[in-house]
Amino acid sequence: MAIRKSQVYLSTVNSYLIDSPQPSTINYWYNTGSLTGLCLVIQIASGIFTAMHYSSHIDLAFASVEHIMRDVNYGYLIRYIHANGASFFFVCMYGHIGKALYYGSYKSPRVLVWVIGVIIFITTMATAFTGYCCVYGQMSHWGATVITNTLSAIPFIGNDLVPFIWGSFSVSNPTIQRFFALHYLCPFILAALVVMHLMALHVHGSTNPLGISSNIDRLPFHGYFVFKDLVTVFVFLLIFSTFVFFSPNTLGHPDNYIPGNPLVTPASIVPEWYTLPFYAILRSIPDKLGGVIAMFGSILITLVLPVTDRSVIKGNTFKIFSKTLYFTFTYNFILLGQLGQLHVEVPFIEMGQIATFNYFTYFIVLVPLVSTLENILFYIGRVTTK
């Protein structure tokens, strides 16, 4: 027997990365998972080297970032890789989530994979938020102030919870230091969650675009899908390198090159682009508590999909109504992202409220309604063809 199969640790690697049977019909959208894993490795590696030269003291945080950029050998490269890596991490993650929504990867028997994936997404958002605050530029300070202040809407404990998180009566030195500690810790929690995600996936294997059982036609992972993944890895590295070397600040905000000043409020407080859809949902609800519930609910509501999607056919490949609904939802999500960076004024307020209503309607009403309708049409078609 080959050593990769007989040795305890190598046999585990073999079962996941070499002999793992994969559906022969999976397409390039399934590569977003491996790209997201690559981004996590890049972020952990670049983050460790950045942390070697970073100071989390509020008086030194901004200066230490400039020190990394100007004085550390290749510090500018490490910092730009880490900053742009965060954006590309979310690009790949949103693509991975979009693939799962389109191909029905959340349906039984892969519900656990989906639930762990949602937990990974929430943890990633927390990691990104705490990291964004560590720079302590003007947008970092006010972003931290606004987002943490939303927790004051929680009944009974909200007003005590916010100073507890800050460690003071405002965003100050204890806040930045504890945010940095959490930011350093969270990626390793993410890595553990990713391992759990892969373990849950390994039980039943990947889905496929056809939405049918692929047990009769599978191929080993190594040799076929390793090289298929490498194609998108090289394309990803090409695009990623273009941003890092030629346009490193495109995905950032210019106000964050101004040191954080609690006495000067920016013209508009805009978080990082990957949080904008949820920020738009937060702003669309006039009531503060309602906005906070809607923002967190917009992520947690994805957990109901395995229940609300009643379709007997996995995925949207052969379902025209679900496919149309999916692309409408995608457009609505992008619209929320655009509205999140605009000023709170007419007509953007009303547009945000309509887009927020459409977002929740998709999960609660449209998915069960359309999937039930398609089931009826499917059964009618099956009876008439007999």
Curated annotation (Swiss-Prot):
Heme b b562 binds at residues 82, 183. Fungal cytochrome b-c1 complex contains 10 subunits; 3 respiratory subunits, 2 core proteins and 5 low-molecular weight proteins. Cytochrome b-c1 complex is a homodimer. Binds 2 heme b groups non-covalently. Coiled coil: none annotated. A ubiquinone binds at residue 202. It comes from Wickerhamomyces pijperi (Yeast). One of its GO terms (molecular function) is ubiquinol-cytochrome-c reductase activity. GO terms for biological process: mitochondrial electron transport, ubiquinol to cytochrome c. Belongs to the cytochrome b family. Disulfide bonds: none annotated. Component of the ubiquinol-cytochrome c reductase complex (complex III or cytochrome b-c1 complex) that is part of the mitochondrial respiratory chain. The b-c1 complex mediates electron transfer from ubiquinol to cytochrome c. Contributes to the generation of a proton gradient across the mitochondrial membrane that is then used for ATP synthesis. This is Cytochrome b. InterPro entries: Cyt_b/b6_C (IPR005798), Cyt_b/b6_C_sf (IPR036150), Cyt_b/b6_N (IPR005797), Cytb/b6-like_sf (IPR027387), Cytochrome_b (IPR030689), Cytochrome_b_C_euk/bac (IPR048260), Cytochrome_b_N_euk/bac (IPR048259), Di-haem_cyt_TM (IPR016174). Heme b b566 binds at residues 96, 197. The chain crosses the membrane at residues 32-52, 76-98, 113-133, 179-199, 225-245, 289-309, 321-341, 348-368. PROSITE patterns: CYTB_CTER (PS51003), CYTB_NTER (PS51002). Its main location: mitochondrion. Its cofactor is heme b. It is a multi-pass membrane protein.
